[in-house]
Regions:
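Extended, compositionally biased accessory segments flanking or bridging domains
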Residues: 1-63, 68-69
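Histidine/cysteine-enriched polar flanking segments
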Residues: 2-18, 25, 59, 81, ...
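Structural motif
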Residues: 23-27, 52-54, 85-93, 115-118
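Flexible, compositionally biased loop and terminal segments
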Residues: 57, 80-83, 103-107
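Short acidic low-complexity segments
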Residues: 70-79
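A polyampholytic, Gly/Pro-enriched intrinsically disordered region
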Residues: 88-92, 97, 133-138
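Glycine-rich, aromatic-bearing surface loops/beta-hairpins
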Residues: 109-181
């Protein structure tokens, strides 16, 4: 990791690279809720690393082109990463992690994206509802990954999240705000 210097943003002394660290409660949930977006990020050159609990079958994640880390706790990976994605169930159950993730948002240190019930991050306006439209490749890889987990492929065209600190340019964004209802 030390040799990587393909920075996308400089804030003060920190160079952020195209690194996305993902913290998931389980493999099935991440593939269903965020597999296409993560696959598209990996195919676009991001280093996507998923932390899942130990002793899980991670074949579906490797199909999506993702690296897997089964170390716990996942807090060690958060400093210096350009983006963090977290399962809302993990945020609900781990107060220390929730506080750490929200501190990244408050300090504008990283893009933070959450899938699932957004209530653990609060309704205070720091997070916006966003959507990712899956590429054809991501739809195909996600369908295969879902088969590996024994799940039936749902509508694979879009995935929705809540996200904060969208720092990349609007013309290159892969997470687009949802219109207000």
């Amino acid at each position: 990791m030390a040799g990587k210097r393909s920075g996308v943003r400089i804030t003060g002394e920190t160079v952020h690279t195209y690194d996305l660290h993902v913290i998931a409660a389980d493999v099935d949930g991440i593939v269903t809720a965020a597999g296409g977006w993560l696959c598209d990020r990996a195919r676009a050159g991001w280093q996507v690393t998923v932390t899942v609990p130990p002793d899980r079958d991670v074949r579906a994640l490797t199909i999506l082109g993702l690296d897997v880390d089964t170390h716990e706790p996942a807090l060690h990976a958060l400093p210096g990463t350009a983006a963090v994605a977290v399962d809302a169930r993990v945020l609900r159950d781990d107060e220390r992690l929730r506080e750490r993730v929200l501190s990244l948002v408050d300090a504008a240190r990283a893009e933070v994206t959450v899938w699932g019930d957004p209530s653990p991050v609060g309704p205070d306006g720091r997070f916006d509802r966003v959507v990712h439209r899956l590429s054809a490749a991501a739809r195909a890889f996600k369908a295969r990954a879902l088969q590996t987990t024994g799940q039936v492929a749902p509508d694979l065209a879009v995935e929705t999240f809540v996200s904060a600190a969208l720092w990349y340019p609007p013309d290159g964004a892969d997470l687009m705000p949802l219109p207000e209802r």
